[in-house]
Amino acid sequence: KVPRIKINENSSLKPVNYYGLSKLACENIINYSLQNKKNHYAILRYFNVVGSITDLKINKKIYSLFDVISKRIEKKNYKININGKNFDTVDGTPERDFIHMEDLCKIHDKVFNYLKKNKQVTLNCGSGKRYSVLEVIRAFEKKIKRKFYITYKITNPDETQTICSDNSLLKELFRQDITKKKIYNLIKNY
């Protein structure tokens, strides 16, 4: 059984793929380079970023599950692949913690001000809520009132079954609540 724990800033870091290894290497370089210097710095651990901020003309979307689904809708191609259906999750598909770009911008602003008086901070930037890949697809189906044809692919051996942030430090330091953690708010801009 896969543990349903949330990852906090002090959790043991055990990357399962090269992407995770590169993120950890960058954290180590930043910490090693700056810990004994006068520089103030933050390590922000992004979970799965979605959305865009069209009001500010920053409308380049990040390549994510949400973008893949919205591109399929745009092209009227309602076929989609899911990598794996035998995970120990609510519906067998991988679970992720998604955070909207608007919430990330608010976090960045608060971290910038925090660093004026504090040397360093490491923060999880996630919603603290898990959604499975299938739940995300079903939410889009509900929004567009149309079903997707889903094909399940062989699971990548490096695929993480479930991941979720413990964002309690973020809430404690900044009284920051993630405003777009409900699935319908996450898909609203797509």
Give the positions of each predicted feature.
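C-terminal catalytic core of Y-nucleophile DNA break-rejoin enzymes
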Residues: 65-66, 100
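C-terminal substrate-binding subdomain of Rossmann-fold SDR/epimerase-dehydratase oxidoreductases
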Residues: 71-190
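Catalytic helix-loop patch of NAD(P)-dependent Rossmann-fold dehydrogenases
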Residues: 1-50, 54-64
